[in-house]
Regions:
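Residue-level signal for inorganic ion chemistry
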Residues: 29, 48, 83, 98, ...
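Phosphate-binding loop of NTP-binding sites
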Residues: 4, 78-213, 217-227, 291, ...
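Acidic, Mg2+-coordinating active-site environments of NTP-dependent enzymes
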Residues: 3, 62-66, 173-325, 347-351, ...
């Protein structure tokens, strides 16, 4: 540990928090000057100081003499991470680490809801799940919190291992493993190796491993680690009991139902969840099972989750327009999440379907094959209009000649704006770079 971390930690305790963005920082924040490929964070140090920063952590010696409130370090990012590690060691609370190819953020949100029945919980905000976001999240945990939930993302082998050294999880869950970020991981085996770094850390540090035994890859981990907790429920997708009592979950594609106890009559009533789809069914099961590990009754978890609304973050949002539904799932996309979304929307209602599907990025050598598979899948569906968007989706178009392909978002938008639809379910899904959520305003106009 650098000698200055202890001193910096004292200044952190006296501050109003940490900031890495001078545009949003608050008075008395400590400002860390982080640099990227196209910017030097040190250039914003004086601006941060003028806005009330109590201290600026810089790593460019040329700035060192400009103010006594500039703290020169070897590397600002390394110092941020070391400060987070030091803070984590001071926190005497369990931290749940969550990673996986799909469903990390939704499962994190559901688990926060379930754990809040009994505990004061801090959970990663938004998608702060990388080498910058994880230390910032750890530094937001304070003495009032009783449990932390830290989401961990990765696009190459070794990244989860590094994040574990910062967050030091005492319990961990991998939601699932699929073909995501293949370009960085190099292969599916690389994805498996990278995601399993969470379990490796827990195994070495006497942490509790929780395995989603619905996932065919994760099932292979059951014998690899000692005493894992398995997500409860059988393989049936019709009726999965989550305890020995009458409470349970039911999946009638695509809807999820809870058996919730009526506090007045004491009887169990079937209530429809605000989430839908097989993938969210598993996300709910994982959240309830982890909460049970922390001594929270499944019925109490279910009652909270049953009334929970998906936040407006472009993930599995359902927007009702007249007799139509927009299913907005445009935060990101990979082969498995794309397949899940298409199949769930196909069963969503009796409406005809409109698919607006964008590129799946970071697939490396398997990109052409996986985009072609999307085309094959959609070609088998009846009563559908399919709009493919982006360079890579041309391969999908070639496999579905009844579809339409647009090289750019603007081309797709201009074509779609001239159309009219009634009583349809519209899926909007693609990688983040396309920002397909922009189409919702136009969709609301043409769904008349």
């Amino acid at each position: 540990m650098q000698p200055q971390i202890k001193d910096l930690y004292q200044k952190f305790k006296e501050s109003s928090g940490i900031s890495t963005d001078s545009r949003t920082m608050k008075k008395d924040n400590i400002f860390f000057c982080l640099s990227g490929d196209n910017f030097d964070g040190n250039d914003y140090a004086e601006d941060a100081l003028n806005k009330g920063a109590s201290l600026c952590v810089i790593d460019n010696p040329e700035f060192a003499k400009k103010s006594e409130k500039f703290l020169l370090v070897r590397d600002s990012l390394d110092t941020l991470q070391e400060l987070a590690k030091y803070h984590r060691d001071k926190l005497n609370i369990p931290i749940v680490g969550i990673t996986g190819s799909n469903g990390k953020t939704t499962t994190k949100n559901l688990l926060e809801v379930a754990l809040s029945v009994k505990y004061n919980v801090y959970a990663t905000e938004g998608n702060f799940n990388n080498h910058i976001g994880v230390p910032l999240s750890i530094l937001k945990i304070n003495n009032s919190h009783e449990i932390g939930i830290i989401e961990m993302g990765a696009s190459s082998v070794g990244e989860i291992a590094e994040l574990c050294q910062i967050a030091k999880p005492s319990c961990g869950l991998i939601t699932n493993i699929s073909k995501a970020h293949i370009k960085g991981f190099k292969s599916f085996e690389g994805v498996v190796r990278g995601k399993s770094e969470l379990f490796d850390y827990l195994n070495k540090n006497n942490g509790q491993i929780i395995i989603n035994n619905y996932d065919s890859t994760l099932v292979n981990f059951i014998k690899r680690f000692d005493n894992p907790i398995l997500i409860e429920g059988g393989k049936s997708n019709i009726d999965v009991k989550i305890s020995k009592s009458k409470d349970g979950l039911k999946l009638f594609e695509p809807n999820i139902f809870f058996m919730v106890r009526n506090l007045n009559s004491g009887l169990y009533e079937e209530k429809k969840s605000k989430l839908f789809g097989r993938y969210n069914f598993e996300n709910i099961l994982m959240a309830i099972s982890v909460a049970k590990f922390f001594k929270i009754d499944e019925q109490e978890s279910a009652e909270k989750i049953c009334i929970w609304d998906m936040p407006p973050n472009n993930r599995s949002q359902v927007i009702k327009v007249a007799g139509s539904n927009i299913i907005l799932d445009a935060y990101n996309a990979n082969p498995q999440s794309m397949k899940n979304a298409i199949e769930s929307v196909q069963n969503f209602s009796e409406n005809e379907k409109v698919f607006i599907i964008g590129d799946m990025n970071e697939l490396g050598d398997i990109s052409k094959h996986e985009h072609s598979e999307v085309g094959k899948l959609t070609s088998k569906l009846e009563s559908t209009e399919c709009f493919f968007v982006g360079d890579k989706m041309e391969d999908a178009y070639k496999m579905n000649k009844n579809s339409r392909w647009f090289k750019t978002y603007n081309e797709m938008h201009d074509s779609l704006a001239k159309m009219r639809f009634q009583n349809v379910d519209v899926l909007v899904k693609g990688s983040r770079s396309l920002r397909l959520e922009r189409i919702q305003t136009t969709l609301k106009k043409i769904l008349t």
